[in-house]
Amino acid sequence: MQIKQIEGSLSAKGARFALVVSRFNDFIGQKLVEGALDCLRRHGAEDSEVVIYRCPGAFELPMVAKKAALSGNHDAVIALGVIIRGSTPHFDVIAAEATKGLAQVALDTMIPVAFGVLTTENLEQAIERAGTKAGNKGFDAAMTVIEMVNLYRQF
């Protein structure tokens, strides 16, 4: 007997995507958006199948992601943002709540939610992860969600 193995393909054709983007640290966040859009387009998504929702900060990402997921207008959500450590515990609180909140949205709605939120120690690390030395985490998040949409379609 052979074990059946199911995987999601990397075709975005026909899928509808919501990008939920934090405006805080937007000069880096916009690079994540560009990376995500590049990935979606390269894998067959049409611009008409993508909606970008912008919210004030990373703390608001889960709320907007949940609204997008529950709208019935999207097959997946890509959450993008940039949280850079400062000199207070604020970073730890925001990073933890955004992470937990986005995971909860995926579990509650059964809509794939990709985590493209940078949590870095400094500005240099954030810039590296938005398209210079360490690739573009927006692109990576879009790739993840494309695969998850196609995996979900096989259940």
UniProtKB/Swiss-Prot annotation:
Q: Which residues form a coiled coil?
A: none
* GO BP terms in the entry: riboflavin biosynthetic process
Amino acids binding (2S)-2-hydroxy-3-oxobutyl phosphate: 87-88, 129
Q: For binding 5-amino-6-(D-ribitylamino)uracil, which residues are annotated in this chain's numbering?
A: 24, 58-60, 82-84, 115
Q: Does the keyword Transferase apply?
A: yes
- Give the UniProt keywords, A-Z: Riboflavin biosynthesis, Transferase
**Which SUPFAM superfamilies does the UniProt entry name for this protein?**
Lumazine synthase (SSF52121)
Residue numbers annotated as active site: 90
Q: Name one GO cellular component term.
A: riboflavin synthase complex
Q: In which pathway does it act?
A: Cofactor biosynthesis; riboflavin biosynthesis; riboflavin from 2-hydroxy-3-oxobutyl phosphate and 5-amino-6-(D-ribitylamino)uracil: step 1/2
What the entry lists under NCBIfam families is as follows: lumazine-synth, PRK00061.1-4
Q: What does this protein do?
A: Catalyzes the formation of 6,7-dimethyl-8-ribityllumazine by condensation of 5-amino-6-(D-ribitylamino)uracil with 3,4-dihydroxy-2-butanone 4-phosphate. This is the penultimate step in the biosynthesis of riboflavin.
Indicate the family of this protein. Answer: Belongs to the DMRL synthase family.
PANTHER family hit by this protein: 6,7-DIMETHYL-8-RIBITYLLUMAZINE SYNTHASE, 6,7-DIMETHYL-8-RIBITYLLUMAZINE SYNTHASE DMRL SYNTHASE LUMAZINE SYNTHASE
User: What's the protein name?
Assistant: 6,7-dimethyl-8-ribityllumazine synthase
